[in-house]
Amino acid sequence: MLAGTSPIVAPILNRDVLLADLGYYFTAISPTPGTGILETASISTFALAEAAPVISIYNGNPVASSVNIYPLFIRLTVTQANAGGLTTRFTLTLDQGQRVTTAPAATGVLTINNTNMGSGNKSQAQIYAGTGLVTVAASSQRRIVGNQSFRNGGVVSVIGDVYQFNFGSTEQLDPMSLVETGTAICNVTYNFAPVVIGPNQNFQVQGWAASQGATQHGYEIEIGFVEK
């Protein structure tokens, strides 16, 4: 583990290099590069999405540790287009406890790695995605912290679409195409408020589309987060 007095080499104002240098930066990605993770089918309302989220991030650190998880970006690359959805919308929530009652198969357990091979820091995050992921009802503490449509105008997603969520910063913006109502591939990035996932707290990305049919989205997933 790096000592607190370790020299830091980082461009001025670049938070990510500094955090990676200290061993606090992690990525979570789909277990098989090039293969998408299918979400649950026929999720046409927010209520249905809460029971079967696209992504669930649980902070498994002990409460006494005060170690938080801070998502910096989430990138979804469409590998299977949905059928029938009039929009592609994502709602972001925070809640107490581990809401996952049924974890998905191994294909839905994201691979977590520290991006600094010189650091011994290990993540206590539990990050799941896709079909088979089931959660209990939200508690009275549940908070909606974000809500945004990424595809509009009655057009379903297109294989190759990239949907990126950036939290608390304008850094890491991918090339953007806001032509989200046509049938061409679109790369869409939106900024969201900073999110803090405390110990024994759960953060979820719930995807839903009005009139979505039995053919669901499939996504390659990449997440960058800080744990400290």
Give residue ranges: language-model regions:
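Beta-strand-centric surfaces of beta-sandwich/beta-rich domains
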Residues: 1-6, 11-228
